[in-house]
Swiss-Prot record:
Taxonomic lineage from the root: Bacteria, Pseudomonadati, Pseudomonadota, Gammaproteobacteria, Enterobacterales
Descriptive protein name: Endo-type membrane-bound lytic murein transglycosylase A
Cleaved signal peptide residues: 1-15
A molecular function GO annotation: lytic endotransglycosylase activity
Gene3D superfamilies for this protein: 1.10.530.10
Residue intervals passing through the bilayer: none
Recorded catalytic activity of this chain's protein: Endolytic cleavage of the (1->4)-beta-glycosidic linkage between N-acetylmuramic acid (MurNAc) and N-acetylglucosamine (GlcNAc) residues in peptidoglycan with concomitant formation of a 1,6-anhydrobond in the MurNAc residue
Length: 203
């Protein structure tokens, strides 16, 4: 009987540890970053237009599509920065004062995709995440929100946006990352930060 409960405990602890093992499966950024770097002139142009670091744009391209502009995910995300027409694409259109949403063919165009991806990063930083003071924390918050939504992130701190921002401002980058590991409902959220740092280090 004791052996049975010991085995159950081992399985339970293994499950708990694997839940937060954001490094598995392994990810080598070398090739994706190299392919993403070919779009750097466009990323620099889009970054300047929207006030977004082109290295951040390049890292997201490496993570999202590996530099392939024709990629369409099972969930319908399209192109280099894997934008969904009906969500992030629609948000960018609204920001530009346009109606509707971008087409799949538009999002497969590298220049249009990167421009709209940079615009969406700017929307996140200057909208739901506005007020975060630490630049590195802001970067982490932006990429987690890019991947899983700003609302999902902020709700791990508070149901009130301003209270959530104040709690975030009490954390440094490492503390913010640990919070995401422990509190964010999406297991890919801490993994995205981990991949972001690996991609930036590979540039």
């Amino acid at each position: 009987m004791k052996l049975r409960w010991l085995l159950i405990l081992v399985v339970f602890l293994a499950g708990c540890s694997s839940k937060h093992d954001y490094t598995n499966p392994p990810w080598n950024p070398e090739v994706p970053v190299k392919r993403a770097m070919q779009w750097m002139p466009i990323s620099e142009k889009a970054g300047a237009a929207w006030g977004v670091d082109p290295q951040l744009i390049t890292a997201i391209i490496a993570i999202e599509s590996g530099g392939n502009p024709a990629v369409v995910s099972k969930s319908g995300a399209v192109g280099l920065m894997q934008l969904k027409p009906s969500t992030s694409g629609r948000d960018v259109y609204r920001r530009m004062g346009w109606r509707g949403e971008p087409s799949v063919s538009e999002l497969k165009n590298p220049e249009r995709n990167i421009s709209m991806g940079a615009a969406y990063l700017s929307i996140l930083e200057n909208g739901p995440l506005a007020g975060i003071k630490d630049p590195q924390v802001m970067r982490y918050a932006v990429v987690v929100s890019y991947a899983n939504g700003a609302g999902a992130l902020l709700r791990t701190f508070s149901s009130n946006r301003q209270d959530a921002i104040e709690e975030i401002n009490d954390l440094d980058a490492d503390e913010f990352f640990e919070h995401v590991v422990k509190k964010h409902p999406a297991p890919q959220a801490p993994r995205y930060i981990w991949k972001l740092q690996k991609a930036l280090d590979a540039m």
